[in-house]
Amino acid sequence: MQEAALLVLCYLLGSIPFSYFFTRMLTRQDIRKRGSGNVGATNVFRTSGPGVALLAFLGDLLKGLLAAWIGQSTGSQLLLVICVILAVIGHIYPVFLGFKGGKGVTTSAGIILFLMPDVTGILLLIFLAIVYFTRYVSLGSITVACLLPLVSLAMGKPWSYVVIGILMAALVVYHHRENIDRLRNGSEAKITDKA
């Protein structure tokens, strides 16, 4: 019973739509009706500016950190995997917004930061380099998501961490399908483009 409650808690934690809340509170706008319509920090940055985006980013990052801490505290590697993936699923399919949320990148980053700070550092450098040279946040997100399980495996992380990396990569890439199509045809918005 206690384990089930923790799993529900992790999903609900992931479901807290910080991008929506901060945009609504500070700009009185509905992020779902602005820019790409995505409930994530990148869309907040492009539509509401860096200040609001930073708050949204930190909120989503914190969700991942807390979910990883909860999962780790159970002492079970299986429960850890389920807890953190439920948090990411909660972010993507939030009960509080009719199951239409973000793409799971920042919440995943919070989880990896808690579990594997060394891997996070490597992937962050790669992400920043890609975004700096291409101005495509989506390309950076997709690339580091794909690299996550490979880097985790190469650095000898526990099997549960590698599984988490594989599942996160699958979720992130799947929910970037439209971005991938736009990258291919050259219509993807850059971080410097205003919505």
Curated annotation (Swiss-Prot):
Pathway: Lipid metabolism; phospholipid metabolism. It is found in: Cell membrane. GO terms for molecular function: acyl-phosphate glycerol-3-phosphate acyltransferase activity. The keyword Cell membrane applies. It is a multi-pass membrane protein. Keywords: Cell membrane, Lipid biosynthesis, Lipid metabolism, Membrane, Phospholipid biosynthesis, Phospholipid metabolism, Transferase, Transmembrane, Transmembrane helix. This is Glycerol-3-phosphate acyltransferase. The lineage of its organism: Bacteria, Bacillati, Bacillota, Clostridia, Eubacteriales.
